[in-house]
């Protein structure tokens, strides 16, 4: 490894030779980042991306002004899926260094897991990786159950089984119980439900190549809620939380589900499949039924669910949906504290009725008459949350993954949302 390039911070503008808008300058001692007080964390992240683009793979964050948030902003921009990078961190107090180390361990796990090729990360591997991460931070305070294949059908998990049966890799439900109280009768404070589609071809409603080439990332919701629980534990979470990951491939085969199929769920709802590429909501429904059965104060589901959310928000914000205004406000406050981007989109009672079917209670996708795709998807999920008007948040993870690099991010997963959900759990 080469000698480290020193990176320092300054509140003074760059020398005029670098231009009036320069955010960094190069000198004999290394590189100086010039903070202007407007968006210092964003400036640091963008500068780190540029430094990586120069081919500098070994840096030392040096001098005054560095704290955990600024170090983390640098790493968010500096990290990329290819190559090895080394950062020598500045001296931080014990609490800040622990916070930074926990972010590096857990949020990097989220990014690396989402970036993993689908060939090496199937449903079973995703579930086991989640167990390993949570067990690493929680020890014996965790128990779990993995249900897969035909056992899912026999136990009534018909959405997950239906979507996943077309793959040679069995669908999997992970039910994990973090119980720091040690009391088996302790109430469940929160349930987290994640969409874990480890590859999404679209099924018989097959995607075009341009929309399929990033579908290894369709398990981003599952990775995000797993990381959020792990991170909340490192921040002292002392309440019982259950995690449900609904993991499957959505592939084409002679055994794959078809348009016109009808799925009957354990809560009695019948759903007609009119688009096999709207599979995420079908698997999440099973997890939400289980979550509701725990009678928690809070249910949060996270999923890379709709293209409509990305159309509205790009990859810059996660989309938030809820009937509970106070709870949505708490989540947005947590996002502001953690400097993570969330934006609330509409969800009203009428969205629940915009999925009509001639053969079942619900259709799994909206029609031309009801084009608000992200809102109708959230409305669909609400049919599987027992008390959907209170205590439920749906996150459509539009900021989880970038197909191409931008000025502040490399291509690939971002890890955004982990800290916000953890903040809400520990508030």
Curated annotation (Swiss-Prot):
It catalyses: Release of an N-terminal amino acid, Xaa, from a peptide or arylamide. Xaa is preferably Glu or Asp but may be other amino acids, including Leu, Met, His, Cys and Gln. Its main location: cytoplasm. Gene3D superfamilies: Zn peptidases. InterPro entries: Leucine_aapep/pepB, M17_PepB-like_N, Pept_M17_PepB, Peptidase_M17_C. GO terms for molecular function: manganese ion binding; metalloaminopeptidase activity. Its cofactor is Mn(2+). This is Peptidase B.
């Amino acid at each position: 490894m080469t000698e480290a390039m020193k990176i320092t911070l300054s509140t003074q503008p760059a020398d005029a030779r670098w231009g009036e808008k320069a955010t960094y300058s190069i000198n004999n001692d290394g590189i100086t980042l010039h903070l202007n007080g407007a968006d210092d964390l964003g400036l640091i992240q963008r500068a780190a991306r540029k430094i990586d683009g120069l081919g500098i793979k070994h840096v030392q964050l040096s001098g005054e002004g560095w704290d955990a948030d600024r170090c983390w902003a640098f790493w968010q921009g500096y990290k990329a899926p290819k190559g090895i990078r080394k950062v020598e961190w500045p001296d931080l107090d014990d609490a800040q260094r622990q916070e930074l180390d926990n972010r590096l361990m857990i949020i990097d796990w989220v990014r690396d897991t989402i970036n993993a090729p689908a060939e090496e990360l199937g449903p079973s591997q995703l579930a086991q990786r989640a167990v390993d991460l949570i067990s690493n931070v929680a020890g014996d305070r965790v128990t779990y159950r993995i249900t897969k294949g035909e056992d899912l059908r026999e136990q009534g998990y018909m959405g997950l089984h239906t979507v996943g049966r077309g793959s040679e890799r069995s669908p999997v439900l992970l039910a994990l119980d973090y119980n720091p109280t040690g009391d088996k009768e302790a109430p469940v404070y929160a349930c987290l439900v994640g969409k874990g589609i480890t590859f999404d071809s679209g099924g018989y409603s097959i995607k075009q190549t341009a929309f399929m080439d990033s579908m290894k990332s369709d398990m981003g919701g599952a990775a995000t809620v797993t990381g959020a629980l792990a991170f909340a534990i490192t921040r002292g979470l002392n309440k019982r939380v259950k995690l449900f990951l609904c993991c499957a491939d959505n592939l084409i085969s002679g055994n794959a589900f078809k348009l016109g199929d009808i799925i009957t769920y354990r809560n009695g709802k019948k759903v007609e499949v009119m688009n096999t590429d709207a599979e995420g909501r079908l698997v999440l429904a099973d997890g939400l039924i289980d979550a509701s059965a725990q009678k928690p104060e809070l249910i949060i589901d996270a999923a890379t669910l709709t293209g409509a959310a990305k159309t509205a928000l790009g990859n810059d914000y996660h989309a938030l949906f809820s009937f509970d205004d106070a709870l949505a406000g708490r989540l947005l406050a947590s996002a502001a504290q953690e400097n993570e981007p969330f934006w609330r989109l509409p969800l009203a009672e009428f969205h629940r009725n915009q999925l009509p079917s001639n053969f079942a209670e619900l259709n799994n996708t909206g029609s031309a008459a009801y084009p608000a795709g992200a809102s109708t998807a959230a409305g669909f999920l609400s049919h599987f949350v027992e008390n959907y008007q209170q205590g439920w948040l749906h996150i459509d993870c539009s900021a989880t993954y970038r197909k191409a690099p931008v000025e502040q991010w490399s291509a690939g997963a971002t890890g955004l949302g982990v800290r916000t959900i953890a903040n809400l759990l520990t508030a």
